Amino acid sequence: MRIGTDIVEIARITKAIINGEMAFYERVYTSHERLLINPAEPDYERASGFWAAKEALVKAIGCGFRDGVRFQDIEIKHDAAKAPYFVISGRLQEIFIGQGLQNNSLSISHCRTHAIATVIVY
């Protein structure tokens, strides 16, 4: 079992979204996530939480965003109780399985200025 945590300033992600426009959205967020964030009226807190969650996951796995691992390999969805969970694909899924990992748990939270995510992989 391993743990990963990430915290990000919401202002940082807000700036990246505003300055990067659709290029940032398309690089970092899946089409499902982009619908939840809503580019017409962006939910910067949610976008920041998703960013922190993806960073926390690669920290828990210990691989980072290199060697073919992309932000798009990680999708955040919500179950019937609105709890977030990951759908992992691509190179990251290969690494996850290759390390003998089978499951994960995700928690995301935010306040006015920061978003934080904690991930446990096991």
Swiss-Prot record:
<keyword id="KW-0444">Lipid biosynthesis</keyword>
<dbReference type="GO" id="GO:0000287">
    <property type="term" value="F:magnesium ion binding"/>
</dbReference>
<keyword id="KW-0479">Metal-binding</keyword>
<keyword id="KW-0963">Cytoplasm</keyword>
<feature type="binding site">
    <location>
        <position position="6"/>
    </location>
    <ligand>
        <name>Mg(2+)</name>
    </ligand>
</feature>
<keyword id="KW-0443">Lipid metabolism</keyword>
<dbReference type="InterPro" id="IPR008278">
    <property type="entry name" value="4-PPantetheinyl_Trfase_dom"/>
</dbReference>
<keyword id="KW-0276">Fatty acid metabolism</keyword>
<keyword id="KW-0808">Transferase</keyword>
<comment type="similarity">
    <text>Belongs to the P-Pant transferase superfamily. AcpS family.</text>
</comment>
<dbReference type="InterPro" id="IPR037143">
    <property type="entry name" value="4-PPantetheinyl_Trfase_dom_sf"/>
</dbReference>
<keyword id="KW-0460">Magnesium</keyword>
<dbReference type="Pfam" id="PF01648">
    <property type="entry name" value="ACPS"/>
</dbReference>
<dbReference type="GO" id="GO:0008897">
    <property type="term" value="F:holo-[acyl-carrier-protein] synthase activity"/>
</dbReference>
<dbReference type="GO" id="GO:0005737">
    <property type="term" value="C:cytoplasm"/>
</dbReference>
<dbReference type="InterPro" id="IPR004568">
    <property type="entry name" value="Ppantetheine-prot_Trfase_dom"/>
</dbReference>
<dbReference type="InterPro" id="IPR002582">
    <property type="entry name" value="ACPS"/>
</dbReference>
<comment type="function">
    <text>Transfers the 4'-phosphopantetheine moiety from coenzyme A to a Ser of an acyl-carrier-protein. This isozyme may be involved into a specific lipid biosynthetic pathway that also includes Z1545, Z1546 and Z1547.</text>
</comment>
<protein>
    <recommendedName>
        <fullName>Probable holo-[acyl-carrier-protein] synthase 2</fullName>
        <ecNumber>2.7.8.7</ecNumber>
    </recommendedName>
</protein>
<feature type="binding site">
    <location>
        <position position="55"/>
    </location>
    <ligand>
        <name>Mg(2+)</name>
    </ligand>
</feature>
<keyword id="KW-0275">Fatty acid biosynthesis</keyword>
<dbReference type="GO" id="GO:0006633">
    <property type="term" value="P:fatty acid biosynthetic process"/>
</dbReference>
